[in-house]
């Protein structure tokens, strides 16, 4: 192994050390693997749901967000939004949805790769996955704000509704409508994965830092 590669990946664990303290080195690997698996599972799970309460629909209308699509009463909600000048929901986050599946798979691969890196560079590999839940919420809030603040002035009810920002995490109200958001399974799987990554980093540092320091000061 070249010196540059060794600086990046870190020292190998001596066979006698691995035999004596096997759990110390396996725990961070298992935590990283579990985090990667949860992210992969989250792709098929819903991340966020919005209930729209409207006088015309006593039971409410629902739209459910997966990482790569929106399902539910999308057409009905678009029909109501048309009157206040809001764009169709399928125009939101088109780029994000197109890369989401491959992006999450790539994040999971980086987490798995982190199990083979024994230096501080491991943090860079897992950092994107660590902040994925925050990135998801921030992007979702961006699009909600973008749609709510850019209403079509030519819409039938545009004069009766001021631009607004629909909240992503709490109840919102506009005219006679109210929105009730809810975080779902996919999001919580990603949050759990982030927690496993944090714990994995703790055990990773505890396991490999002594080896790195010993390599620097033989």
Please identify what each model-predicted range represents:
Residues 117-151, 171-172:
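Mature, soluble, non-transmembrane domains
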Residues 29-38, 95-116, 123-134, 188-195:
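Hydrophobic alpha-helical transmembrane segments
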Residues 20, 147-154, 193-218:
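Cytosolic juxtamembrane helix at the C-terminal end of the final transmembrane segment
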Residues 10-23, 175-176:
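Cytosolic juxtamembrane amphipathic/interface segments immediately preceding
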Residues 42-96, 142-181:
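Long, glycine/tryptophan/cysteine-rich extracytoplasmic
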Residues 6-16, 77-84:
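Membrane-proximal N-terminal segments immediately preceding the first transmembrane helix
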């Amino acid at each position: 192994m070249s010196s540059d590669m060794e600086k990046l990946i870190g020292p190998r664990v001596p066979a006698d050390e691995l035999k004596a303290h096997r759990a110390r080195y396996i725990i961070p690997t298992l935590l990283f693997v579990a985090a990667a698996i949860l992210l992969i599972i989250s792709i098929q799970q819903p991340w966020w749901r919005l209930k729209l309460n409207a006088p015309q629909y006593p039971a409410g209308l629902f739209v459910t967000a997966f990482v790569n699509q929106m399902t539910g009463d999308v057409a009905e909600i678009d029909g109501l939004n048309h009157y206040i000048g809001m764009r169709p929901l399928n125009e939101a986050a088109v780029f994000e949805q197109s890369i989401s599946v491959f992006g999450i798979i790539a994040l999971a691969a980086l987490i798995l790769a982190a199990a083979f890196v024994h230096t501080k560079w491991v943090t860079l590999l897992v950092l994107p996955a660590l902040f994925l839940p925050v990135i998801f919420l921030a992007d979702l809030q961006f699009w909600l704000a973008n749609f709510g603040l850019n209403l079509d002035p030519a819409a039938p009810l545009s004069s009766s509704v001021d631009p607004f920002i629909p909240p992503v995490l709490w109840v919102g109200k506009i005219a006679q409508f109210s929105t009730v958001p809810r975080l779902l399974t996919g999001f919580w799987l990603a949050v759990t994965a982030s927690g496993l990554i944090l714990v994995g980093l703790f055990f990773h540092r505890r396991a490999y830092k002594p080896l790195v320091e010993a390599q620097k000061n033989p």
